[in-house]
From Swiss-Prot:
Domain of life: Bacteria
Assigned EC number: 2.7.1.165
An example molecular function term from Gene Ontology annotations: phosphotransferase activity, alcohol group as acceptor
Effect of residue 47 to A: Very low residual kinase activity
Cofactor dependence: Mg(2+)
Role: Involved in the degradation of serine via 3-hydroxypyruvate. Catalyzes the ATP-dependent phosphorylation of D-glycerate to 2-phosphoglycerate.
Reactions performed catalytically: (R)-glycerate + ATP = (2R)-2-phosphoglycerate + ADP + H(+)
Outcome, altering residue 47 to R: Significant decrease of the kinase activity with a 180-fold decrease of catalytic efficiency
The protein's name in its UniProt record: D-glycerate 2-kinase
Keyword Nucleotide-binding: yes
Amino acid sequence: MFDPESLKKLAIEIVKKSIEAVFPDRAVKETLPKLNLDRVILVAVGKAAWRMAKAAYEVLGKKIRKGVVVTKYGHSEGPIDDFEIYEAGHPVPDENTIKTTRRVLELVDQLNENDTVLFLLSGGGSSLFELPLEGVSLEEIQKLTSALLKSGASIEEINTVRKHLSQVKGGRFAERVFPAKVVALVLSDVLGDRLDVIASGPAWPDSSTSEDALKVLEKYGIETSESVKRAILQETPKHLSNVEIHLIGNVQKVCDEAKSLAKEKGFNAEIITTSLDCEAREAGRFIASIMKEVKFKDRPLKKPAALIFGGETVVHVKGNGIGGRNQELALSAAIALEGIEGVILCSAGTDGTDGPTDAAGGIVDGSTAKTLKAMGEDPYQYLKNNDSYNALKKSGALLITGPTGTNVNDLIIGLIV
């Protein structure tokens, strides 16, 4: 029988080891030898860019003529021989984003039909790789991105707008590289692995239209300038002939690993979904309800059980607190699980960061909400104010891993004994 502390340690162990299964260096090293590449320009963009680039360098060495890496602040792990390594803003682009994107375009503008760009792409690329269309300022992009992120819009909707305001998104980067070829290795952080949505699809034909982008802005009541509206009307490319793409990792892989690890530990384990994409607090309440069903009725699984969920929820920010979707999901579940023994829920961003915080997510049990109440705090008020970070910090329920170097959505595990 597990005591609360050992159950907590086990949940964290399963989460961490599952994430290791989608470490980008492993996937890159497995894929590159099959591609017969020589004398390439390497461009790596995203939260996993550094590790992907390092692995590519270890495989290809001097076959890489030039390498440029663009990743999130704090995600570079040091120099790579003869590579230029930059860090930039996420989830909102900043001045460094613009500078580094210009640098990448300088490189590819010199290429001809005999050249190849090895494009290593991972989640976060929408913010880290950006150059607005003429007439649109960085400030306008920042304001619009922030509004979309707070609106509750899905990642597909957000990226539909982003693609229509960018010189590199929605297939425009591959269009700019032409007549050179793009060989892309993609680590997916998008449910369904849609290549036109991952990092806003810089090297894939865009299936969305200008009309779609305008409808998203209208749906969420987001005001924009006339210059932004004019820019959106410039349609993205719908056909590209110079692109070869390889998908090397996704949320299905991390969930499969979690299931396998839980079974090894003696749990009845099942993946409930890899497409969780509702409001974070609703997801927390829903997952808690299934955990209670297992706890008290032994269905849909008998105890000891491990319920595994993959996906990416959204948070419609109405309060002025701090947190992220995984922390909000965990806090919501903690409220629903209050007082129940032998249950634990761990919700984590596979990149090790959740919202604008230092936490990867939260790990809660039946005592989390009780701990807050014993301090004279109301957990529901924290949830209402979108202040999950401070609630979980006070109750000792934050999950802090540091940047993992990968990014394939979120992993949620519920253990019931």
